[in-house]
Structures are given as structure tokens and as C-alpha cells.
Amino acid sequence: FSVGLETRVTVPNVPIRFTKIFYNQQNHYDGSTGKFYCNIPGLYYFSYHITVYMKDVKVSLFKKDKAVLFTYDQYQEKNVDQASGSVLLHLEVGDQVWLQVYGDGDHNGLYADNVNDSTFTGFLLYHDTN
């Protein structure tokens, strides 16, 4: 799947709902919840590239209610910045993966508009053979 934000995110500590769908043919990403649902066990690659504007940002990638990757970017006044992260994860059927802003509202500079994108992508590299 490959998805993006359509507007600035304002709510911390809940899954970010990426509603701009670039690719989601198998429908394993649910835009209403912001979560990827694993239907095929195996090794997955996830990445995110976020635009930072107006505030610092703290973003976590979660697997099954546990943060496994953290990204922090400090906003530089009057500039748009970028931050990114990527990880390989082994998933079982039923596992869920998502991104969320963590902390308080002071660290919620995650941004998107018609010329600045924030994206989240994931795909299966190898399925389990046993």
C-alpha cells in the first residue's frame, strides 16, 4: 500500500488516518482506521516520509500496540522540513501496523497540503513458507 495525508493532522496519540490513496489494491490498509492489517504472514518493509511545518514533530510506527520506531524533527522557523523512517518487520496474520504522533500537542507539526506530502508505505518482501 502507499497512502498520503490530505490535510494537517491535529490529534496526537491516535493512529494517523492517511486518506489519499496512491495504491491499495489488496485493501490491507484501512483509511478509516489508519491501520495496515496483515493477511499474509511474512517479512514487510514500511516507510514514511513526513512534511514538518509550524511545530516540532514526534512520530512513532506501531506494531500491535507497541511503538517500534520513533522519529523526531525540530521545526526551523519559516521553513518546511522533512523527516522519515523505515523498518523491516515480521508480521503474523492479524497484526496491525500504523503511525501516530506521540506526546502532547506541542509536537504535532505533521503537515500536508496541495504541494507538500506526508506519506506512509508498506509492502510484503517475503511470505512465510511454513
Where are these regions (language model features)?
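Extracellular jelly-roll beta-sandwich "head" domains, especially the C-terminal globular C1q domain
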Residues: 1-130
